[in-house]
Amino acid sequence: MSMPFSSLGRYGLALIVVLCLGYLQTASAMSIRELRALKRVNPKQGADFALYYLVGTMEATVNADQAATRAGAAPRICLNGRRLEPSMAVSIYSAELRRNAELYEADMPVALVMMNALATVYSC
């Protein structure tokens, strides 16, 4: 009785699965702890990298809420003509962490904090 996969084929398949899982890991959201570590580990550029990440997270959160609204979900973020600029990302994020410090654990994603912050500041 022959096996459908040779041992080389099984190792190749296992390698592909491991690589795919590795790529899935790189696509995960940054946690609060990782964002703080980014600032500490790289003193010269860490703050800039964190700022870029927060701005991107803020824009992605607004776009995701708008897409969900177009798909029929109730909106959570309503700008209503108020301004939302990239320079506001850090202050909105930091204010949410201060306001609800007991709710957030270090392993929670930054995107969750940003969604709650924007929903609070720009409530519907």
Language-model features, listed with the residues they occupy:
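Surface-exposed, polar helix/loop patches in the mature regions of secreted/periplasmic/lumenal proteins
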Residues: M88-C124
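Short N-proximal segments of mature Sec-exported proteins
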Residues: M30-S94, A117
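N-terminal signal peptide c-region/cleavage motif recognized by signal peptidases
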Residues: L21-T26
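Absolute protein N-terminus
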Residues: M1, S28-M30
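Bacterial N-terminal signal peptides that target proteins for export
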Residues: S2-L13
